[in-house]
A protein has these predicted regions:
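Bacterial N-terminal signal peptides that target proteins for export
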Residues: 1-7
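Hydrophobic h-region of N-terminal signal peptides that target proteins for export
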Residues: 11-19
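Exported/periplasmic ABC-transporter solute-binding proteins
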Residues: 20-45, 51-54, 58, 62-68, ...
């Protein structure tokens, strides 16, 4: 499946060759809905259409290594952007958001979702694949910190990324799932009792870095990077459930 995602992402671009006025953005699945909202404003002000691709951070990283011609990569970690800079594939790296995770429950879950929900009776718990998705890595850290990683092994269902995990939860295929706080807040038809905002003390910080890719449309990618750093856009990113890093002076 992973190899198919890598090849599929590269083939996706065959039909794009020669197109102008488009910016190709590879974005981690947790930030997809947020990017959809803010990219429309970028298009309105610049005339550039933003074309978004959104598997897991690990899958996007592999696609870039295999030549997928994205212009800018918005990861859910620092590791992959760092590696791209070291390999001479990317530059101008910066942190655009600090991710937060939440534990969500299905509609019929009998009580408010809290840390204790993990210690009670349920069928399945979905988490993003820790090897591919930074939010999955954080979820594994949470369970390990709570001494639940081994006891819950038979109940854990792995999603490819946090978007897949959210789908498993939304369709009722699992009772509980670790998702991004942004996804939790997006479900406006639910009360806040359906998710638990995981304390930062239970996992390492999720620093989400962006990197401009050297083989892409660097001029417009830099315009988009400046757009992400603007006060108005940073305020909107916070509204979607992210913390914000301090910008370098």
């Amino acid at each position: 499946m992973f190899i198919k995602c890598v090849i599929g992402g590269i083939l996706l671009f065959i039909g794009f060759v020669g197109h102008t006025n488009q910016l190709y953005v590879a974005v981690a699945s947790n930030f997809y809905s947020t990017l959809q909202q803010i990219s429309s404003e970028f298009t309105a002000s610049t005339g550039l259409k933003v074309v978004i691709t959104t598997p897991s951070t690990g899958t996007l990283y592999a696609q870039i290594l295999h030549g997928a011609p994205y212009d800018i990569f918005l990861a859910a970690d620092q590791k992959r952007p760092d590696e791209l800079v070291k390999k001479g594939i990317g530059e101008s790296k910066f942190t655009y958001a600090l991710g937060r995770i939440a534990l969500g429950s299905i509609e019929s879950f009998p009580e408010p979702t809290t840390e204790d929900s993990l210690k009670k009776s349920f069928r399945y718990l979905a988490i993003p694949n820790p090897e591919l998705a930074p939010y999955g890595h954080a979820a594994r850290q949470v369970l390990t910190t709570l001494n639940l990683w081994q006891p819950l092994q038979k109940k854990i269902v792995m999603g490819e990324n946090v978007g897949h995990t959210f789908s498993l939860l939304a369709t009722g295929n699992v009772d509980l799932g670790f998702i991004s706080l942004a996804q939790a807040l997006s479900r406006t038809n639910r009360t806040n009792t359906w998710f638990w905002k995981v304390p930062l003390a239970l996992h390492d910080p999720i620093r989400q870095d962006a990197v401009i890719l050297n083989k892409g449309n660097m001029e417009d990618a830099k315009r988009f990077a400046a757009f992400l750093k603007s006060p108005v856009v940073r305020s909107k990113i916070r509204q979607f459930g992210y913390d914000l890093p301090e910008l370098p002076r």
